[in-house]
Regions:
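Radical SAM enzyme core and accessory elements
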Residues: 1-27, 31, 37-39, 483-610
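N-terminal [4Fe-4S]-dependent radical SAM core
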Residues: 8-38, 45-46, 203, 209, ...
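N-terminal pre-triad scaffold of radical SAM enzymes
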Residues: 39-43, 61, 248-274, 298, ...
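Conserved SAM/AdoMet-binding glycine-rich loop
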Residues: 40, 113, 295-403, 407-446, ...
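Canonical Radical SAM [4Fe-4S] cluster-binding loop centered on the CxxxCxxC motif
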Residues: 51, 252-288, 594-610
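A short beta-strand-loop structural module common to alpha/beta enzyme folds
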Residues: 66-78
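Glycine-rich beta-alpha loop elements in corrinoid/cobalamin-binding modules
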Residues: 75-222, 459-507, 515-529
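Flexible glycine/acidic-rich beta-alpha junction loops that bind and position SAM and/or redox cofactors
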Residues: 77-78, 153, 207-211, 317-318, ...
Length: 610
């Protein structure tokens, strides 16, 4: 360990974040390595180590001969201060070596509020911020993750973007880099070759021009780059990598358990949900393989909790059979199975009993909207009756805590829809009174609302976010309407949601704003301890750009959007059709009921695994 680090660690919070040495961390002999990869997560250790995608790609890269992938996380403020004071560059956990010793610096970016953390980590690593300043092959700075479906705000800082699922594409990129270095290519030669790989977007190979009103006038590829870059997917989930020997963190993290991915994609088609669109098509992992991974992961790590994870886990066809298969093993080892947010329309007592075999926790449902009219607009095909029946089932089975998630500011929302949220909570309370076997325990109902953020590649990508003032008015309206003492109301901070809406649909000009805000001190914007909207507004003002242009403006369907060179596999025509259906309050059936022709099926030969 670096002597400077030894002196620093006693002075910072949670020093275990920075020392590595965890069980299952990969260590290799440097003399046998020709390519080193710094896999960076632009958030804290606790958040990054909870990310399944990072665990998967860490394993994929470390299975390559001659390649060593190491982890790097954004330091907390106290650690950053100590690093800068000691003039100690950012380092990787496995070896402790500075990031400048690495060939490839790869960022996993799932959230727009992490953009300034990317700049901060590059600076802490003593790596030039701008891609144009990094003229050699080393380091090659790449980024992937769902936030990269619109990478334009950070286009000036990233050499290339990996779109979609990275298990196969990451290997191809690393091998291409090794070829480039072995044959003495220039960086431009490498970037031009990378752009020919399916799923690779190279920002510097696209010229973007603007109209006088600030909208994009043209996106022009050059040097043979494709006009449209389509994401990559894993075709067969049974052949895809799963991190059975996952790293066991040395300090508590957010998701400190085995995360078992059952399938990718979603059959439901909620019109606001970016993940539901960009992870299409549906591809399932076989039940037997899921069970095998569960047993082996628990045996190896000692974890006693397993999350059965997918976008809509209860839509996994053999879910009940999987729980049956795992029942004996989990009972013997005192392992609990848990699910993330459940759908109210397919929740059952049978499923609940299997979950209750372990530690019985509260249940979470996401109705998203307070009235059926608005649920139809967003294609959340769940009725109030279905929600209440699920709650009755849960309360009768001994559950006494329910969390309900909603959004405020959805397209066409009215005050009646907002007040409908309070009505839903009251009806859930009434369902408890009707169904609970032991009323002495009481009940806890938590209503949480977030501010709707329109996202690229969704049916609502053209919509405006409501103003901050209007959002806060609706929050207050709902606060006053929730009068039951057993109902707790939590709402999301408005400032971060506003900036998220700006960055999510931003263009390349926001790169100047990002850098200006970072130089003013922005770095861990996903954390309220460090976020300052005033700092960002000053940066916008200095750069002569209006954030409301990005967040609060309805786009014409004819407008060329900044991310128009990127395809998630879902066609623009389908997204427009879904938008029109929304305004007509017409729902679209789920993919299992009827193929709606979104286009994603063409990524898997024409037929989805629904």
């Amino acid at each position: 360990m670096d002597k400077r680090l030894e002196r620093i660690l006693p002075r910072v919070q949670k020093p275990a974040r920075y020392v590595g040495g965890e069980y299952n961390a990969v260590l290799k002999d440097k003399t046998e390595i020709d390519t080193r990869i710094a896999f960076c997560f632009p958030d804290t250790y606790e958040i990054g180590m909870s990310n399944l995608g990072m665990r998967i790609l860490y394993g994929v890269m470390n299975e390559m001969d001659g390649v060593w992938c190491e982890r790097v996380f954004a330091p907390w403020g106290d650690m950053e201060e100590e690093l800068r004071k000691a003039d100690m560059p950012l380092f990787a956990l496995e070896s402790g070596d500075p990031i400048t010793d690495f060939d490839i610096v790869a960022f996993s970016v799932g959230y727009e509020m992490a953009f300034t953390a990317i700049l901060n980590m590059l600076d802490l690593a003593h790596i030039p911020l701008h891609a144009s300043e990094r003229t050699g092959l080393t380091p090659l700075v790449i980024a992937g993750g769902t936030a990269m479906y619109n990478a334009e705000p950070i286009a000036d800082f990233i050499d290339l973007v990996s779109l979609g699922e990275g298990e196969d594409l990451t290997v191809e990129l690393v091998e291409l880099y090794r070829t480039a270095r072995r044959e003495g290519w220039s960086k431009q030669q490498l970037l031009r070759a990378a752009a020919q790989l399916d799923g690779v977007y190279v920002p510097s190979l696209y010229d973007v021009t603007y109209h006088k009103d600030g909208t994009v006038s043209a996106i022009t590829p050059k040097d043979g780059a494709p006009a449209k870059v389509t994401k990559r997917i894993v075709h067969d989930m049974d052949k895809s990598y799963f991190p059975v020997k996952t790293i066991v963190p040395s300090t508590e993290i957010v998701q400190d358990r085995v995360t078992l991915e059952l399938f990718r994609g979603c059959i439901r088609g909620c019109r606001f949900c970016q993940a539901g669109y960009v992870y299409r098509p549906v591809r399932s992992r076989s039940r037997d393989l899921c069970a095998d991974y569960c047993v082996r992961s628990c045996d190896d790590t000692g974890y006693q909790e397993v999350t059965l994870s997918s976008l809509s886990t209860s839509d996994y066809p053999p879910l009940t059979e999987l729980c049956d298969e795992l029942e004996g093993f989990c009972d013997q080892r005192h392992i609990s199975l848990s699910l993330p947010s459940l759908r109210a329309d397919n929740f059952s007592m049978e499923l609940m009993q299997r979950l209750a075999k372990g530690r019985k926790t509260g249940l979470t449902f996401a109705p998203e909207a307070g009235t059926q009219r608005l649920r139809d607009v967003i294609n959340k095909n769940v009725t109030l009756d279905a929600l209440l029946q699920s709650c009755r089932t849960a309360f009768a089975g001994g559950y006494s805590a329910v969390k309900l998630y909603f959004m405020l500011g959805l397209p066409t929302e009215t005050d009646e829809d907002v007040l409908g949220i309070a009505d839903v909570a009251a009806r859930v309370m009434h369902a408890w009174r009707e169904s609970a076997q032991n009323k002495q325990r009481g009940v806890r109902i938590t209503v949480s609302t977030s501010w709707f953020v329109p996202k690229p590649h969704t049916a609502f990508q053209w919509e405006a976010q409501i103003s901050k003032e209007e959002y806060e008015r609706r929050v207050q309206l709902l606060r006053e309407a929730i009068t039951t003492k057993t109902v707790t109301y939590n709402w999301h901070d408005s400032d971060t949601s506003f900036l998220e809406a700006v960055l999510a649909r931003g263009d390349r000009r926001l790169g100047r704003v990002l850098e200006t805000a970072w130089r003013k001190g922005a770095h861990l914007d996903a954390w309220e301890e460090y976020f300052s909207l005033d700092r960002w507004l000053e940066a916008f003002d200095e750069c002569g750009l209006d954030p409301h242009f990005y967040a609060n403006r309805v786009r014409s369907e004819d407008e060329l959007l900044p991310w128009s060179m990127i395809s998630s596999g879902v066609t623009d025509a389908y997204l427009k059709r879904e938008r029109h259906q929304a305004y007509a309050s017409v729902t679209t059936p789920d993919c299992r009921t009827h193929c709606n022709g979104c286009g994603a099926n063409l990524l898997v030969g024409g037929k989805c695994d629904v």
